Amino acid sequence: MRVVQKQKFPIEGTKRLLPAASNQARGLGEYCRDFLFNPQNILPETIELIERFHVDSVGCAISAIHHRANACTLLRHEAMQTRPEGTSSGGFCFGASTPVNTTKCVAANVSAVREWDSNGTNFGYDKKSGRMAGEFGHNDFYPVAIAAGREAGFDGNQTLRLMLLIDEIRGRLAEVFPLRRYAIDHVHHGAIACAAGYTAALGGTTADVESAIGLVVSQYVPFRALRAGHQLSDSKGASAAFAAETAVMAAQRALHGFRGPQDVFRNPLAIYRLNEPSNDGMSPFDLELGESGNVFAIHAIDRK
């Protein structure tokens, strides 16, 4: 593995704080809607980085499909048997020209992106802010932004912004809550980010985003059993794919009016307070998210 040296540049821009004493799920909904539809200026070095990471991920995906890696081949075959539902425009699997069910498309494409384990890694460590929970994660979720952008009619710039939004949410969650300490797989932070970003992109309200997040946290938490044992299964490489799939499913249900658990970060029986007890009315952490400039978690990702 060769880690590319990060370029040094002045850090500038604004952030939004979601305090532990607030409804952070609702706050994420407001943040997502503002980030996508009331955009502030993002500096070129951030846009260039998200473009580079996306291109890298596509290269990984095409290689995995070409070599017929098992998990992504099976999930792609599964997706190609489907068609878009209702008024949905659906999504395209890598290398295909026929639209398929969006949820199945996302699972297939994220699996392909992730198969070679060659994308960037964030380590959940921001010494300046003191947020150093140290959870890691990978930028495997760009197919969710592509699918949502197609459904929403986004142009390329809007879709890049959605990619950045997903990376920002999962990157900042990694700084404040160490999933691995509680045997929870790191892709869960990505699932929350995907559910929030997808719901907002398709015009969901802040309440819809809150519901989608609540569904992901209460119904679809992946444990690290998928990485344990002497012989690892296809589930390890496909963990991000299944996280993305369930996130999009939760988002679609929320958009159709399903009400998931509210205020889930302060829910005493959700994974956060259950594992890191805090007083009533408090989550275990503040959450701070970049809004403009180059103050984004993506700049802490190591490139392989």
Functional labels for PLM-detected ranges:
Residues R2-V295:
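N-terminal core-entry segment
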